[in-house]
């Protein structure tokens, strides 16, 4: 591992940020918010029940604001120095790279291929890497694409390393034409050749997608005969085995295709179960001490990504900081994901300053020993396993009870825990053992998914697993390099994006009610108080109910002639509070290079997600708690870079998206997710119409008077935030509100108006 010589410079540096001005802003916002709530309480008797409802909603918003402030209070980052690893090149550990996929239709094979090719081409010794692709759909098309990709990789990987290309996903690299100013004849020739070969690869994959009979001509595909996505045996195939030596830049890493056994009457635990199967198979074949987990729609955008993670893991292990994993910031090449990037940049750094970032499911380098259930207390100062842990973990009966009855698996676990050198075995010799650990019943009565590996009982397996790791006392590190380490694609279209947000929120809320969830670990002394608050951020999804109510309150007050906002001085406090919040969030966007329009669009997106996806996630969890239905892991449809739908020519991070922002290309379908937004817009239109013609009822307030200009401005602001739904009322086709949605929303709006007037 890392050289222990103190004369060597540090591999990484932890940077803590202290901005007293921002802290003053946080405290000012909280102070104004608290004074507004006090005013609500003191004058409740002077107004009707609207003030009580407003107090409830604003109290929820205050708690969320307080929670976010606690997390942002002491941001931190980690700066790696990958160039310094060259002094320790012989000490670099092996890394197993996991790429899970499940559906060749919703996750196109060429997209999976691009991700794999980008990982194969990273700046790291090829004989130290192994790429495992888990295909939960058992698709011959995915396997075919992987085989063809392995042939192209023999051209692509040497090309990338020879010319030190920055982007190593071919679909993204070849979007930009070769520079006319480039006079290097050899480079031009190699560039043209590599591009031609990549286009051949794409055509082969596309042809095979359109004609599945092409796959039947090869004997290698006989194993896929009579297989179904949810009914098939375990498949383990070595696509390519690296047999080269150290420093051979023409070699490519191992490529292994796996698909675990699936039967209709067995629970498979979705992606989480696939990740645990990847952990077992890789343990049997290569057993690298570190694991890089990347979603199939996220490619490596920085060639030094593995080296950056190693800087932290090797440095942390040297100083015994108990670092369990390194999480990279999740970024996208789509032009509609500014909000996610901003949240991760500011909130992610804040959490990194506590016990470490939360594992977000992709772009993360794990330590295998940690994933096998060990805690920092199980190790001595020098990093060796303690005598107590040795007796507990390495006894044969204990190993079988925890990891299953496979002798080969138990041996690999012992080697991984003790950090024994992994001999360069022939991969094909481990195929039978790998198939054994892929059986449906293998995990039965073991600790897989409970305390070992990726944890079950939630569709948000990343958050569940992260809680389990931190509750054992581990820390984690956050890297936010200037060049995004990984870039991914958001789901194709607004309906798919809202569906993904609904799935995420469902998993987050589900953790609150899980009997087997490691959420109980939040009360462990090994997890810091503010880190507990970081995980309790999942309750922000529950604010969708007060958010929906608050969007309707101005309209209700106009119809009912009630007062929502305070008068005089406290109206000024309310306006000041909103103004400071807007200026602060605008600064967050502009500090990352985004425009004012990007900020405006993101404010609208945030409201839409909160009142649609998050709202229906609460409905999903309610049905589960009542025993009516179970939560379902939904695979969202992904787009391929370079296609029109993928916004391949769209701006990168920090660029202005211009007037053709996705806000003005809001696509509708018949999904119920569009119902709340349409309903909100119709209600506010009706309220403004009633107010403008003076058809309000007489005020029943005691001393507060009726509604006025402030409530009308509130309605206008709500409609501005839901502008896509307002525009959808006047458009046709996919950019217009479907008649079914409009009819239901209109009926509900009429009921709301009738009972409000």
UniProtKB/Swiss-Prot annotation:
One of its GO terms (cellular component) is Golgi membrane. It is an enzyme of class 2 (transferase). Its main location: Golgi. The chain crosses the membrane at residues 18-38, 50-70, 533-553, 569-589, 615-635, 674-694, 710-730, 737-757. Expressed in young seedlings, primarily in the vascular tissue. One of its GO terms (biological process) is cellulose biosynthetic process. It is found in: Golgi apparatus membrane. GO terms for molecular function: cellulose synthase (UDP-forming) activity. Its EC number is 2.4.1.-. Gene3D superfamilies: Spore Coat Polysaccharide Biosynthesis Protein SpsA, Chain A. It is a multi-pass membrane protein. InterPro entries: Cellulose_synth, Nucleotide-diphossugar_trans. Belongs to the glycosyltransferase 2 family. Plant cellulose synthase-like B subfamily. Thought to be a Golgi-localized beta-glycan synthase that polymerize the backbones of noncellulosic polysaccharides (hemicelluloses) of plant cell wall. This is Cellulose synthase-like protein B1. It comes from Arabidopsis thaliana (Mouse-ear cress). The lineage of its organism: Eukaryota, Viridiplantae, Streptophyta, Embryophyta, Tracheophyta.
């Amino acid at each position: 591992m890392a050289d222990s010589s103190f004369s060597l410079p540090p591999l990484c540096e932890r940077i803590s940020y202290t901005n007293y001005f921002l802290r003053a802003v946080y405290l000012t916002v909280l102070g104004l918010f608290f004074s507004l709530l006090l005013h609500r309480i003191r004058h409740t008797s002077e107004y009707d029940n609207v003030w009580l409802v407003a107090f409830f909603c604003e109290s929820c918003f205050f708690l969320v604001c307080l929670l976010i402030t606690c997390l942002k209070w002491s941001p931190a980052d980690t700066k790696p120095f990958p160039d310094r690893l060259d002094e320790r090149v012989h000490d670099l550990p092996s890394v197993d790279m996991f790429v899970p996929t499940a559906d060749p239709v919703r996750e196109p094979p060429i997209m999976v291929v691009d991700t794999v090719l980008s990982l194969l081409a990273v700046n790291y010794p090829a004989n130290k890497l192994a790429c495992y692709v888990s295909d939960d759909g058992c698709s011959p098309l995915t396997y075919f694409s992987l085989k063809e990709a392995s042939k192209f990789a023999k051209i692509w990987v040497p090309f990338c390393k020879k010319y030190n290309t920055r982007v190593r996903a071919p679909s993204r690299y070849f979007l930009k034409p070769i520079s006319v100013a480039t006079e290097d004849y050899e480079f031009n020739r190699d560039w043209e050749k590599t591009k031609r070969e990549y286009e051949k690869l794409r055509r082969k994959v596309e042809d095979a997608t359109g004609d599945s009979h092409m796959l039947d001509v090869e004997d290698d595909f006989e194993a896929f005969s009579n297989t179904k996505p949810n009914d098939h045996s375990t498949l383990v195939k070595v696509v390519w085995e690296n047999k080269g030596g150290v420093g051979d830049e023409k070699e490519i890493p191992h490529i292994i295709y796996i698909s675990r056994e699936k039967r209709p009457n067995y629970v498979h635990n979705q992606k989480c179960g696939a990740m645990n199967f990847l952990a077992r198979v890789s343990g049997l074949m290569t057993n690298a001490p570190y694991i890089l987990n990347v979603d199939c729609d996220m490619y490596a955008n920085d060639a030094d990504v593995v080296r950056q993670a190693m800087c932290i893991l090797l440095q942390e292990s040297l100083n015994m900081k108990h670092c369990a994993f390194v999480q990279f910031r999740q970024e996208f090449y789509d032009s509609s994901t500014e909000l996610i990037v901003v949240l991760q940049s500011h909130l992610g750094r804040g959490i990194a300053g506590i016990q470490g970032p939360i594992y977000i499911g992709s772009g993360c380098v794990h330590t295998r020993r940690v994933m096998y259930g060990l805690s920092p207390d199980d190790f001595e100062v020098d990093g060796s396993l303690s005598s107590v842990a040795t007796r507990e973990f390495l006894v044969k009966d204990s190993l079988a009870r925890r990891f299953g009855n496979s002798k080969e698996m138990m041996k690999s676990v012992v080697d991984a825990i003790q950090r024994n050198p992994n001999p360069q075995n022939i991969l094909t010799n481990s195929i039978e053992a790998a198939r054994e650990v892929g059986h449906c019943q293998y995990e039965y009565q073991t600790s897989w998914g409970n305390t070992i590996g990726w944890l079950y009982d939630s569709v948000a397996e990343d958050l569940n697993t992260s809680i389990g790791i931190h509750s054992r006392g581990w820390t984690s590190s956050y890297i936010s390099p200037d060049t995004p380490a990984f870039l991914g694609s958001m789901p194709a279209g607004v309906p798919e994006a809202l569906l993904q947000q609904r799935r995420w929120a469902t998993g987050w809320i589900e953790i609150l009610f899980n009997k087997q969830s490691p959420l109980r670990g939040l009360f462990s002394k090994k997890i810091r108080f503010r880190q507990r608050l970081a995980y309790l951020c999942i309750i922000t999804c529950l604010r969708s109910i007060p958010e929906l109510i608050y969007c309707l309150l101005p309209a209700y007050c106009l119809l009912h002639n009630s007062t929502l906002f305070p008068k005089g001085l406290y109206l000024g406090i309310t306006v000041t509070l909103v103004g400071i919040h807007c200026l602060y969030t605008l600064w967050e966007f502009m500090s990352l290079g985004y425009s004012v329009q990007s900020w405006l669009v993101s404010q609208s997106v945030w409201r839409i997600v909160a009142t649609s996806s998050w709202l229906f996630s609460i409905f999903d969890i309610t049905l589960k708690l009542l025993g009516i239905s179970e939560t379902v892991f939904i695979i969202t449809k992904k787009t391929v870079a370079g296609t029109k739908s993928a916004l391949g020519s769209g701006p990168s991070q920090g660029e202005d998206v211009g007037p053709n922002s996705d806000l003005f290309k809001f696509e509708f379908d018949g999904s119920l997710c569009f119902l709340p937004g349409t309903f909100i817009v119709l209600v506010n239109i009706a309220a403004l119409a009633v107010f403008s013609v003076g058809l309000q009822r007489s005020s029943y307030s005691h001393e507060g008077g009726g509604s006025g200009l402030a409530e009308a401005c509130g309605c206008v602001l709500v409609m501005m935030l839901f502008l896509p739904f307002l525009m959808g009322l006047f458009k046709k086709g996919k950019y217009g509100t479907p008649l079914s949605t409009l009819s239901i929303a209109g009926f509900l709006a009429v009921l709301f108006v009738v009972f409000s007037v």
